[in-house]
Structures are given as C-alpha cells and as structure tokens.
Amino acid sequence: MSKLDLNALNELPKVDRILALAETNAQLEKLDAEGRVAWALDNLPGEYVLSSSFGIQAAVSLHLVNQIRPDIPVILTDTGYLFPETYRFIDELTDKLKLNLKVYRATESAAWQEARYGKLWEQGVEGIEKYNDINKVEPMNRALKELNVQTWFAGLRREQSGSRANLPVLAIQRGVFKVLPIIDWDNRTIYQYLQKHGLKYHPLWDEGYLSVGDTHTTRKWEPGMAEEETRFFGLKRECGLHEG
C-alpha cells in the first residue's frame, strides 16, 4: 500500500473514489486495529483528529488511537443535551487518558434554538435532521476546517447498525480521509479490550443503555429492540456526522 493523494481523490466522482480506495481497503481489512492506525499515520496526510461522542464503548477508540498518537486532538460536538453521566464520563476519560479534547458547539445556544424553532427533536425526521445539522454537522465541519484536518479517525463498527454494516476501513468524507480502525470489532472484542486495559463502559451501560446520545432522543434497550431503535425514536440511526 502506498501513500494516497487526497486532492487527486477529491476530484473524482464518489463512485470512482470508492473504486480507487478498494485495493487499499482490501489490504487494511487484513490488519488489526493498531496496524490500521499506524498505517494511516504513515501514509495519510496530517493534521489528524479523532472524533468521539463519549458513548457506551468510547473508551476503546480513545485509548487505542491516543496510545499510538499521543495528544491527537479529540473532537466532541456538544449539543448541550448530553446526560449528566456523559459529561462526567468525558471529564473522567479526559483526565485518565490525558486527552487533547476539543469541544465544538452550535453557534446558537440550546435555549435560543428552542425559542426559534421549538423542540426540533419532536418534529419528526425533518426536525431531527435540522437539529442534527445545527448541533452536530455544522460544528464538526467547523472543527475540521479550523484544525486543518486531512485525516479523521472514528470509532464506528459494522455491528452497531444496518447503516454501518458495509462501511470500509478507509473512505473520504467531507473532503478528508476517514479511518475506522475498529470497524470489524464485535461486542466481545470490545469487552476484552476494555478488560485488558482497565477501561470502563459508559456509566449508563449498567442501567440498560446500549447507545447514548442526547437525553431527549435516547431510550433504554428493551427486549425485542434492535440497538439502532434506541436512538431518535427509531426514525433514524445516524446523527449526521457519519453520513454523506
């Protein structure tokens, strides 16, 4: 596998970009997660960042990438509606792993948004998508631009939902390389990694949550539910950050 030219790939249509990365992805599938991170740091351009929602299994990718690339900027898009347990978990992991945390928020406060638009998350798919654009997508786009990012690491896994089932290790999204080192990990591998390194699940894991986002669009898991049904009232799985 050789170094890749981001500018040249960005000039290609999306389908051609996917085909151009196919051979590299075939090789990356054979590497372990640490090998994928090391390859990306050697062959993809900086600046590098890692995004995290500090969700149920967030400690895995935060520990894994930060061990190989200490002080890598960690981007959190804070909606202002996270669980209190999430904010405390962020503080705990930032201190424990010595994270270089970069917090980005919407340009409008949560209260101002409610005054202008009402409770967008109660306004069906269209309202949820607008909410996500304001609170997740725009802040992330701003972070990528301000930090001059060319390579973005994230902790998505195929097992998490149908929308992630066919994601490759390496893609181009929002004009930058996107690397998913643990894309093929299952829940057992996640558990083993946490145990091996003395790391914890999000505190709400013990209360029956499989996925954690905002307080108003996250539900506890109940028998018969798919994991993706615990978010956004089952209307959609993605918050917008990992789409497009």
UniProtKB/Swiss-Prot annotation:
Catalytic residues as annotated in Swiss-Prot or TrEMBL: 239
Pathway(s) annotated for this protein in UniProt: Sulfur metabolism; hydrogen sulfide biosynthesis; sulfite from sulfate: step 3/3
PANTHER family: PHOSPHOADENOSINE PHOSPHOSULFATE REDUCTASE
The protein's Enzyme Commission number: 1.8.4.8
The protein's enzyme class: oxidoreductase
Protein name listed in UniProt: Phosphoadenosine 5'-phosphosulfate reductase
Keywords in alphabetical order: Cytoplasm, Oxidoreductase
Role this protein plays: Catalyzes the formation of sulfite from phosphoadenosine 5'-phosphosulfate (PAPS) using thioredoxin as an electron donor.
A GO-annotated cellular component: cytoplasm
Keyword presence, ATP-binding: no
Chief site of localization: cytoplasm
Catalytic function, reaction form: [thioredoxin]-disulfide + sulfite + adenosine 3',5'-bisphosphate + 2 H(+) = [thioredoxin]-dithiol + 3'-phosphoadenylyl sulfate
Pfam families found in the cross-reference section: PAPS_reduct
